[in-house]
Amino acid sequence: MRYWAWRVQAEDPLPPPDIQIFALYHDSAGEHALPDSVGLSTGLMVLAHVYADRAAQGENNVVLAHELLHTLGASDKYDAGTGQPRAPDGLGEPLRQPRYPQNIGEIMAGRIALGPEEATMPASLQEMRVGAITADEIGWR
């Protein structure tokens, strides 16, 4: 991937970017999971697997933003085994009482927690927030 990114950059007459983001679009027909997207802090590049469907634009933007924040040093806020947002760091409203359902998600959790074992994909970035720990990791606080 780094070689390919270098080749793309070498042929580009514009000044080199700080971060390179590549979106690989997949057919949205059928029920299939996409390969994992990757954001690399070394090399500052993103390879995001997203759906080629206007209806998926909001979800695609969440994936792109999530991976972009990895390049800046943010860590995942979800359980790697289940994909569930980790409480409280992976919750958009960590102090909410009752805790569930959450109305918004933490961008590095990638989903909105509806319960301890249930989550949904956000429809857009407007349903996500950068939590305190993520803000610290990327130097916003």
List PLM regions with ranges.
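Metzincin-family zinc-dependent endopeptidase catalytic domain
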Residues: M1-V62
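Surface-exposed patches in mature extracellular/periplasmic domains of secreted proteins
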Residues: R7-Q9, Y78-T82
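Glycine-centered secondary-structure boundary/capping sites
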Residues: A10-P16, G73, R96, P101
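Short loop/turn segments at secondary-structure transitions that flank enzyme active sites
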Residues: D27, R54, S75-Y78, L114
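Metalloprotease/metallohydrolase-associated module, dominated by Zn2+-dependent proteases
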Residues: S37-T42, V46, V50-A55, G83-R141
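Active-site recognition of the HExxH zinc-binding catalytic motif
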Residues: N61-K77
